[in-house]
A protein has these predicted regions:
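Short, intrinsically disordered terminal tails adjacent to the first/last structured region
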Residues: 1, 206-215
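Hydrophobic, aromatic-enriched alpha-helical segments typical of multi-pass transmembrane helices
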Residues: 2-204
Length: 215
């Protein structure tokens, strides 16, 4: 019981630390634009605030890991929980395999660097994998709830479906103009869903204090 509630707190703290790290690191870099530059540039190889950037990415990974545990503990989900766990692993990959920004984070997303290598390829694959795992987790909750056989509430299925559509639409905008802005809105969408799931999964039944089951 306590571990599940604690997981919800860790998820919230992880998301807060992620955004604090992103905002703090961005302010410290001259010329960095939240509208035009990727978040991962802050953690890039060549970034003067790489430590803060990496810390932010790891905080996001911790939030996903905690939510995975909350879902597994509350609902015994053998599909959704592993998918969120996989998203946590993908987030960790982004922190470990950092993109090359030899001239620093500012403008890194807008310039083609000759130092692009296999590490950058792994980083890009990690971004794609993260989105796929999160989308799959959202759709798993949606399908399970709408079929009426899930331990989580039906409304969470509808909410997850809306967030899945938003995630897919927003991530498609992260390779055009104002990539930094779109990436932030996309991640805000995904992390908001994550916190909703963590919150619902850690709700207590007032009768016995156990995880509340909605089925």
């Amino acid at each position: 019981m306590t571990r599940s509630v604690g997981a919800g707190g860790v998820a919230l703290l992880g998301v807060m630390l992620f955004w604090a790290g992103v905002l703090g690191a961005g302010v410290l870099v001259s010329g960095y634009s939240a509208r035009e530059d990727y978040i991962s540039s802050l953690a890039g190889r060549g970034s003067q605030v790489a430590l803060l950037g990496v810390g932010a990415l790891l905080a996001s990974a911790a939030a996903h890991l905690a939510t995975s545990w909350a879902v597994l503990t509350a609902w015994r989900s053998r599909v959704c929980a592993p998918l969120i766990f996989a998203a946590a692993v993908a987030s960790t990959v982004l922190a470990v395999f950092r993109q090359s920004c030899p001239d620093g984070p500012a403008g890194c997303a807008r310039t083609d660097t000759p130092d692009d290598d296999w590490v950058d390829a792994v980083h890009r694959a990690g971004v794609g994998a993260y989105e796929l795992f999160v989308l799959a987790a959202m759709l798993t909750l949606a399908v399970g709830a709408l079929r009426g056989r899930a331990a989580w509430p039906r409304w969470l299925g509808v909410v997850s479906l809306v967030f899945a559509a938003g995630s897919l639409l927003l991530v498609s905008q992260t390779s055009g103009e104002q990539v930094g802005l779109w990436q932030r809105i996309w991640l805000a969408n995904n992390l908001a869903w994550l916190l909703i799931v963590a919150g619902v999964a850690t709700m207590r039944d007032p009768a016995d204090g156990r995880p509340h089951r909605f089925s």
